[in-house]
Amino acid sequence: KDKENVKTLDDVDLTVNTGEILGIAGISGSGQKELLEAIAGLQNVESGSIRLLDDNGGEMELSGMDSISINEAGISLAFVPEDRIGMGLVGDMDMTDNMMIRSYRNGKGPFLDRKGPRALAEKIKDQLEVMTPSISAPVRQMSGGNVQKVLVGREIAQNPKVLLVAFPTRGVDINTSHVIYQLLNEQKKKGVAVVCVIEDLDVVLELCDRIAVLCGGKISGVVDGRTA
């Protein structure tokens, strides 16, 4: 259910495999974003279960766990939200501080060395060609595309086993879109289970191994992508 206690998802049964990109498609308001937020522990799940297989083949139950509890349990899950400034990055902070915020969420703190986060900020800036005069500038001063590069780069740097991505290319230029698609493909090749919501159907078909179609909060079907 959402914050207003309205049921947004109903009887959703999905599996995402390691080394796979699962796309979530549907018209606006079908529950795509809410599905990712539920997996990430940001939406209340009234019934059912969300399970993650560990390295030994055992199951870890995520249902009922919020995002903080998921991190504290050492569950390797990263989430790139639709809201880049706010839920994603803190607009008034620079890149280094935003890297540190992620470390706090991982339980590393309160006395955190800035050298590691600063090095990560420099690495993301160079590798993803983030256009900013300095990593010390507030991220709010960056363009939407550059903010998205920083956010995606930060989450991928956590080396997650599961990567959830909501509308990663909304409102960004074509070059940034290609960079992000390449990053998602690289994660797939590393064996990460990627779940993403992308609005462009042609991109979904090309990028994703399988696509789950949501309609009214329910799965109406799962189809193979062109890359499958």
Question: How should each PLM-predicted stretch be described?
Answer:
Residues 1-228:
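Glycine-rich phosphate-binding loops of nucleotide-dependent enzymes
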